[in-house]
Swiss-Prot record:
This is Pentatricopeptide repeat-containing protein At1g63150. Belongs to the PPR family. P subfamily. The keyword Repeat applies. PPR repeats lie at residues 46-81, 82-116, 117-151, 152-186, 187-221, 222-256, 257-291, 292-326, 327-361, 362-396, 397-431, 432-466, 467-501, 502-532, 534-568, 569-603. It holds the Pfam family PPR_2. Keywords: Repeat. The keyword Repeat applies. It comes from the Eukaryota. InterPro entries: Pentatricopeptide_rpt (IPR002885), TPR-like_helical_dom_sf (IPR011990). It comes from Arabidopsis thaliana (Mouse-ear cress).
C-alpha cells in the first residue's frame, strides 16, 4: 500500500502530543545529549584495508578499539565509503551493545559531512531506545521524516521496544494500533516485542490474547513468540497456561524446541510438580527433541532437593549414555544431595570425577564440599579442602569462611574460628552478620561470655548490621550466664526499636527472669506479650510460678494454655506433677499423671527420681510409680 510520508509524519506527531509529550526534542544537538564525546579518539594510527574487513571479516570486530580503528580507516579514505558500509560497521557495534559508541561515531560522521540514510537513523533510534532515552529516539524519528525518509517496520519496532522498556506499555499498544491504521503490517518481531513488554508490565492475559490476535491478522507466531509467552507465564507460575500453549503449538504443527521445554520443566521443578516435570521430560524425548545439559540440570537439582538422590544418579547415568556432558551445575546438585544423605564417600567420588573430566570445580562446589564435611564434624578434611581450593586459584568467598567458622565454633574450637576470621580480613573480605553472629554463639557455647560480648561490641563498632538471630543468641547467652541486667538493657533497646521481636526472644527473657528469681517481672512480661505464646512460653512461666510455690496461679495458667489451643507437652505435665508432689497434693498429682498418660506422655527422669525418693521416705506408695511407668 502506498503511504503518504506527510500523512505518516502528521499522525506520528499527533500520537506524541496525545501522550502528553509535546513536540519531540529538537534534533541538531541530539547526539551531544547522550554525552558520547568520551568515545572520541585520534585515528592517526588506523591502518589496513577496511573494505576487506567489511566484506569478509566484520565478525572479527569484537573489541571497541577494533571498531574505532576500522572507523578511522574509513573516514581517512577518499572518497568516503558509501553509507551502506558505514551502516555495516554501526550495526556491528550496536550488536556489541556499545550504543554510546554508535551515537558517538554517528556524531563524527555528521561533523565530516557524511549523510545518514534511513537505515542509519533506524540504528540510532534502536540505540537510544536501548539506552532508555526515548525522547531522543523520537527526535531522530522526527528528523528523518523531515528529511523525507519514511520509517519502516524495523524502525517502528525499535520504537515499540523503547516504549515497552520505558514503562509506557499503553503507548506501545497504541503505537501498534496506529501502525495498522497507517497501513503498516506489524510482523512477528513487532508482536513478539509487544508481548514481551506486556509480560514486563504484568499484563499476562493481554499478552496471551495477543497471540490469537496475531493469527487473526494473518501473522503466524514463531518459536521466539511462543518462547516469550511460555517464559512469561512460567515466571508468573502460570504453568497450566504454559502447558496449554504447548498443546496449542502442537495443534498448529509448530514443534517446540528444547528451550521451550526447558523453561516449562524448570518452572515445574520450582513449583514442586516433580512428577509432571519427569513426564514432560519423557514426552520431550518421545517427540524427538533432544534434551541438553540445562534440561538434565533442572531435573537433577529438583530430584536432589526432594531427597531422591538415587533417581538423580540414574538421570546422570542416562545423561552420560547419551553423550551429554554434565557441567559444574550438575555435579554441584549431586554433591549437595549426597552430603545431605550422609553419603560422604559418594560426594568425594563425584568431586574426583569432576577433576578427571576436566570440569573445574567453582566456589559453590568447594563451599558444598566444605559444608558437607563440617556437617559431619570432619573439620580437618574441611580445612584440607579449603587449602586445596586456594591451591587451585579458586578464591574463597564470605560463605566459604562462614561455613568453616561455623563448623569450628559448633565443635567448640572457637579459637580456630577466630583465626579464620583474621585470615579472612587479611584477604580483604569483610565479616558480615552471619560471621559475627556465629563467633558470638561460638564463644557462648565455649563458656566465654566476656569474649562473646566483646565480639558483639566490635560488630556494632564496625557497623555490621545486626539481625533478630544476633540478638536471640546474645540474649540467650547473657541470660544463661546470669547476666540478666545486661540482657534487660539490650531487650529494652529492642522493644523501642523497629525490629519485630519473635517468641524465642520473649521466651529467653521470661526464662532469664524466672531463673534470677524475678518471677513477678516475668509474669508482667508474659501478660504484655503482643504475640501468641507457644508451649515453651507457657512451660517456662508455669515452671517459674511453681518455683515460687504459686501452684494455684500455675494451675490457672495451665488451664488457660489449653483454652488458648496450645497443647501441653511432656515438660508441662512433669513440671506440674513434681510441684504438686512437693506440695504434698497427691490427688492433684495423680490426676495430672492420668491426663499425661492419656495424652501419650510418660514421666521424665526428674519426676521418676522424685517419686522414687518419696517412696523410700514413705511419703508415697508404689501406685504412683506404677502410674508413671
Amino acid at each position: 500500500m502506498q503511504r503518504s510520508i506527510s500523512l505518516t509524519a502528521k499522525r506520528l506527531f499527533v500520537h506524541w502530543n496525545l501522550q502528553g509529550i509535546g513536540n519531540p526534542p529538537t534534533v541538531p544537538s541530539f547526539f551531544n545529549l547522550c554525552g558520547s564525546g568520551c568515545w572520541e579518539r585520534s585515528f592517526a594510527s588506523a591502518s589496513g584495508d577496511y573494505r576487506e574487513i567489511l566484506r569478509n571479516r566484520l565478525s572479527d570486530i569484537i573489541k571497541v578499539d577494533d571498531a574505532v580503528d576500522l572507523f578511522g580507516d574509513m573516514v581517512k579514505s577518499r572518497p568516503f565509503p558509501s553509507i551502506v558500509e558505514f551502516n555495516k560497521l554501526l550495526s556491528a557495534v550496536a550488536k556489541m551493545n556499545k550504543f554510546e559508541l554508535v551515537i558517538s561515531l554517528g556524531e563524527q560522521m555528521q561533523t565530516l559531512g557524511i549523510s545518514h540514510d534511513l537505515y542509519t537513523y533506524s540504528i540510532f533510534i534502536n540505540c537510544f531506545c536501548r539506552r532508555s532515552q526515548l525522547s531522543l529516539a523520537l527526535a531522530v524519528l522526527a528528523k528523518m521524516m523531515k528529511l523525507g525518509y519514511e520509517p519502516d517496520i524495523v524502525t517502528l519496532s525499535s520504537l515499540l521496544n523503547g516504549y515497552c522498556h520505558s514503562k509506557r506499555i499503553s503507548d506501545a499498544v497504541a503505537l501498534v494500533d496506529q501502525m495498522v491504521e497507517m497501513g503498516y503490517k506489524p510482523d512477528t518481531f513487532t508482536f513478539t516485542t509487544l508481548i514481551h513488554g506486556l509480560f514486563l508490565h504484568n499484563k499476562a492475559s493481554e499478552a496471551v490474547a495477543l497471540v490469537d490476535q496475531m493469527v487473526q491478522r494473518g501473522c503466524q507466531p514463531d518459536l521466539v513468540t511462543y518462547g516469550t509467552v511460555v517464559n512469561g507465564l512460567c515466571k508468573r507460575g502460570d504453568i497450566d497456561l504454559a502447558l496449554n500453549l504447548l498443546n496449542k503449538m502442537e495443534a498448529a504443527r509448530i514443534k517446540a524446541n528444547v528451550v521451550i521445554f526447558n523453561t516449562i520443566i524448570d518452572s515445574l521443578c520450582k513449583y514442586r510438580h516433580v512428577e509432571v516435570a519427569v513426564d514432560l521430560f519423557t514426552e520431550m524425548e518421545t517427540k524427538g527433541i533432544r534434551p541438553n545439559v540445562v534440561t538434565y540440570n533442572s531435573l537433577i537439582n529438583c530430584l536432589c532437593n526432594y531427597g531422591r538422590w538415587s533417581d538423580a544418579s540414574r538421570l546422570l547415568s542416562n545423561m552420560l549414555e547419551k553423550k551429554i556432558n554434565p557441567n559444574v551445575v550438575t555435579f554441584n546438585a549431586l554433591i549437595d544431595a549426597f552430603f545431605k544423605e550422609g553419603k560422604l564417600v559418594e560426594a568425594e567420588k563425584l568431586h574426583e570425577e569432576m577433576i578427571q573430566r576436566s570440569i573445574d570445580p567453582d566456589t559453590i562446589t568447594y563451599n558444598l564440599l566444605i559444608n558437607g564435611f563440617c556437617m559431619h564434624n570432619r573439620l580437618d578434611e574441611a580445612k584440607q579442602m579449603f587449602k586445596f581450593m586456594v591451591s587451585k586459584d579458586c578464591l574463597p568467598n564470605i560463605q566459604t569462611y562462614n561455613t568453616l567458622i561455623n563448623g569450628f565454633c559448633k565443635c567448640k574450637r572457637v579459637e580456630d574460628g577466630v583465626e579464620l576470621f583474621r585470615e579472612m580480613s587479611q584477604r580483604g573480605l569483610v565479616g558480615n552478620t552471619v560471621t559475627y553472629t556465629t563467633i558470638i554463639q561460638g564463644f557462648f557455647q565455649a563458656g566465654d561470655c566476656d569474649s562473646a560480648q566483646m565480639v558483639f561490641k566490635q560488630m556494632v563498632s564496625n557497623r555490621v548490621p545486626t539481625d533478630i538471630m544476633t540478638y536471640s543468641i546474645l540474649l540467650h547467652g547473657l541470660c544463661s550466664y546470669g547476666k540478666l541486667d545486661t540482657a534487660l538493657v539490650i531487650f529494652k533497646y529492642l522493644q523501642k526499636s523497629e525490629m519485630e521481636l519473635n517468641i524465642f526472644i520473649y521466651n529467653t527473657m521470661i526464662e532469664g527472669m524466672c531463673k534470677a528469681g524475678k518471677v513477678g517481672e516475668a509474669w508482667d512480661l508474659f501478660c504484655s506479650l503482643s504475640i501468641k505464646p507457644d508451649v515453651v512460653t507457657y512451660n517456662t512461666m508455669i515452671s517459674g510460678l511453681c518455683s515460687k510455690r504459686l501452684l494455684q496461679e500455675a494451675d490457672d495458667l495451665f488451664r488457660k494454655m489449653k483454652e488458648d489451643g496450645t497443647l501441653p507437652n511432656s515438660g508441662t505435665y512433669n513440671t506440674l506433677i513434681r510441684a504438686n508432689l512437693r506440695d504434698c497434693d497427691r490427688a492433684a498429682s495423680a490426676e495430672l499423671i492420668k491426663e499425661m498418660r492419656s495424652s501419650g506422655f510418660v514421666g521424665d527422669a526428674s519426676t521418676i527420681s522424685l517419686v522414687t525418693n518419696m517412696l523410700h521416705d514413705g511419703r508415697l506408695d508404689k501406685s504412683f510409680l506404677n502410674m508413671l511407668s
